Amino acid sequence: MNINENEYRKLLESIFNRFPSFQRVGGMAYKPGLERMESIANLLGNPQDKFRSIHIAGTNGKGSTSHILASVLNECGLKVGLYTSPHLWDFRERIKVSAGASASAMQMIEKEYVYRFLMQNMAKFEELQASFFEITTAMAFSYFCHCKVDVAVIECGLGGRLDSTNIIVPQLSIITNIGKDHCEYLGYELPQIASEKAGIIKEGVPAIIGEATEESVCRVFRERAQSCNSPIHFSNSASPQEWLSLYLNNLSPASSPDAAELSAFLQQLVSRMDLRGSYQQKNLRAVLAALSQLALNPYFAEALRRGTLAAKLAATPFAKGIEEASRITGLHGRWEHLVADSEGRLHFASSSAEAGYQVEIICDTGHNAHGFAQTGVQIAALAAGTDLPRRLIMIFGCVADKDLDSVIPLLPNEYAPGYKAYYLFVNASGSRAMPSQTLAKRVLAAGFSGEAIVAENSVMPAFEHYLAKLYRPGDLLFIGGSSYVVASLKIENAQ
């Protein structure tokens, strides 16, 4: 089926405009409850019941965890579906399928399938008053069924209990962590938020909990698991090395290397990961805990054995899946390095582009206090350096409903004696962006230095302003504050 590119683009725009999406209108797009999603799925023949799945929720880290786990399963030879949100540059980033380890990378859903699915079902969606996320979730389930995937890794959109994805009955449930975000929908106290996330734990289905240190939160998860007769494992109850050892032992009791070999392998694994942020080590621990349970599932065990025990650990498909998760799954915007060529165009550092400006550029989609508690410290430490500090320039934007009072104290300011970060405040893309002047006023009043770049979608103008007016060789430039800031970057060869 050949489609007209203009018709395809117009159809996608109509979906964004006619059906409420979180990217466009924020909370007004949130339609809690599963009745409408169940009706949509029923009209489509309940495709979600025709493939195995793994369900992942959490305040932060659920996207990275989804991609790492999908990458490992792919490299071990399974045909994997991957559903995540939001997208950065191409709607189709949300829905991907692999053909197993023989393929170089996971592939986005075909434009033809998107077009045909929307044209065939538009009237149904309008009649049911579906949300944008319900439509994309239905599309993902339908596509994974069509592709006959072995397993689909499904990331929750918002919350868990009432999220559109929660009509699946997975093989494993994972909750990465609990923090305060979207509190007006999920609750203002951590146990309330945990209760919403815990809604993805299903009857008899094993559950992995990532970061959970507060007893009140742990209690919520334990009680939910007990009521569902579900085995529950807290990944921070053991070290990554202990989870790796358990994974290998569950695959084959005779195969587990000694502690020294495991320690050396893990250090090498972390150093080679193309998902670079230090926070990825917490996500990796959750993935290893998840794999230790999948190793007990007969459906997954054989593929995992082939991918993990076929050679020395460092040379296995299992290791490759972790080390190259970003490349294999096409995940971008997680502590990602960029380069600027001699004409000021941005490229992924993983490309062959030659740097024309001697500046270290990092972009990250972290967008809430829980996220900045991780990235803020890492940015400041990187700028402070081990010998002489570097100048730190922050291109920063956020959405209008962001709780700035919780984020501002976590932003880098004076990161070394006599060195203060300089901020270029920007409008992120979309109608939800906080105006750069409003953002600047709030942050500068807290003792920061910087200026507002006044332009509609001012992210690229801010970068151009930096190159023209502020650039010095050796600078560290951070771009982030929101997924929409990173999505506004014009990166050569981005999807």
Report residues per predicted region.
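N-terminal phosphate/diphosphate-binding loop that engages ATP/GTP or pyrophosphate donors
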Residues: 43, 67-120
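Short, high-confidence coil segments that cap the C-terminus of an alpha-helix
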Residues: 130, 149-150, 389, 472-475
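Internal gly/pro-rich beta-alpha loop/helix module
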Residues: 171, 185-192, 197-200, 205-292, ...
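C-terminal helical cap/extension that packs against the catalytic core
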Residues: 212-233, 242, 257, 345-362, ...
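Flexible active-site lid/hinge loop adjacent to a nucleotide/diphosphate
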Residues: 101, 116, 122-132, 136-216
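Nucleotide phosphate-binding/pyrophosphate-handling subdomain across enzymes
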Residues: 151-156, 164-174, 179-182, 192, ...
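Hydrophobic alpha-helical packing residues
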Residues: 69-74, 144, 443, 493
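Short functional linear segments
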Residues: 1-58, 65-67, 71-78, 102-103
